[in-house]
Every structure is written in structure tokens, then in C-alpha cells.
Amino acid sequence: MEKKGRVIGIGEALWDVLPEGKKLGGAPANFAFHAKQMGLDSIAISALGNDDLGDETIAAFDEKELTYLMPRVDYPTGTVQVKLDENGVPAYDIKTNVAWDNIPLTDEMREIARDARAVCWGSLAQRNDVSRNTIHDFVKLTPDNCLR
């Protein structure tokens, strides 16, 4: 018997700005992408700014055919500036008060939660009350048999 339901990554979707260029990242978004690569019905949930990086994020997810739910909010799309020291050891400057710090709980998210098979979230997106409350409320809406 095949299990139904979605595998969900909820939390940060951001751009890692590396010396050689930017790369789309965020652990929950990466989790949803890899679940899709394994043939699972997955979705990445976050928030994006009303800016060029938000548009680029949507284009990248569309190109990878990854399902996403990312409301546009009045904060910039998240970035992490990555600098390497002389030994190649990275230092990270994670920008604050960005879109994924302010993920709103939407009606569509509530619906998705009720059909969740598994949900993954990290600690980073919980640094702000708005996203932390959204993640906690989302998880509470998932079925009892959902892997959390």
C-alpha cells in the first residue's frame, strides 16, 4: 500500500553569496529538493521579498520543477554573505530581518499541513517570532502519523 501525503521543508530559503557567485540554499528548501529528487511529492515553504532575488528564487525553483509555497512579503529575500579566510575557512554573515524571518501562516499552508507525510524544519528560521510561530503552528496542524 502506497503512503500518500507530502514531504515538506519549511523555513529558510535564501541565497548563499560566495566569492565565486551566489547559490540558492536554505536547509529546509534543500531538504524538499532532495526529497523530490528521490521521487517523493515534496514542497518547499518559506517567504520571499518583493525583489529581484525573490524573482530569481522562483525562477530557480521553476527550473528545478520544485513545488513551493513562498508568499511575497515586505522584507528582502534572505542572503548569507560567505567570506573565506587565507586558509579557505568560511565565515558567514547571515542577514537579519529578511523574508524568511517573517513567514506568514496562510490558509494554503494550513491545507498542506493537514496532508503532510513528513516535515523538516531547522532552528535558523526560528530566530524570529513570526517564522517561529508559523513553523510551530504548521507542525501542530500535521497529522498524528506525520514524521516530524
List PLM regions with ranges.
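Ribokinase/PfkB-type carbohydrate-kinase core domain
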Residues: 1-8, 60-62, 68-71, 86-148
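Glycine-rich phosphate/adenosyl-contacting loop at the front of the ribokinase-like
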Residues: 1-66, 80
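Short beta->alpha junction loops/turns
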Residues: 47-50, 74, 124
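Short phosphate-engaging motifs
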Residues: 53, 77, 90
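Gly/Ser-rich phosphate-binding catalytic loop and adjacent alpha/beta segment
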Residues: 71-78
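Gly/Thr-rich phosphate-binding loop signature of adenosyl cofactor/nucleotide-binding cores
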Residues: 83
